[in-house]
A protein has these predicted regions:
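Membrane-interface helix-loop junctions and terminal tails of multi-pass membrane proteins
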Residues: 1-138
Length: 138
């Protein structure tokens, strides 16, 4: 398997397991609805672990463009491979998101909370305060 395919599959696994557990907790009429943040953090931990174990021996398991750029910046990864890795990671993330969306297809209509639906795929502040939110993300 090529390192690019490994990054694509690893990132896809990460997103399917990570976003999948969030969908299970926040979307209506799922078996895990309202099971809480500890289930989400544990699910993400398992997702990262499984994805890293699945592809680390093939690609180094960057699974994130920021990691790839950081590794290249400190000289531990070739800049020539950065665009291919990032393309594979973005593609894997999109495919993972599509799989999660399809897996929970009936639950999207059953959930009226727009913030909850959005939370399946990204984080958002509970209290909107640009300065504080920016600091929290840095």
């Amino acid at each position: 398997m090529s390192p690019y395919l490994a990054e694509l599959l690893g990132t896809m696994i990460l997103v399917v397991l990570g976003d999948g557990v969030v969908g299970n907790v926040v979307l209506n009429q799922t078996k895990g609805q309202n099971s809480g943040w500890i289930v989400i953090t544990a699910g993400w931990a398992f997702g990262v672990t499984i994805a890293v174990y699945a592809v680390s021996s093939i690609s180094g398991a960057h699974l994130n463009p920021a990691v790839t750029v950081a590794m290249a910046t400190i000289g531990k990864f070739q800049w020539a491979s950065v665009p291919g890795y990032i393309a594979a990671q973005v593609t894997g993330g999109v495919l993972g998101g599509i799989i999660v969306w399809m897996a929970y297809l009936p639950h999207w209509a059953a959930t009226s909370d727009q913030a909850g639906k959005l939370a399946v795929f990204c984080t958002g502040p509970a209290i909107r305060h640009t300065g504080a939110n920016l600091i929290a993300e840095i």
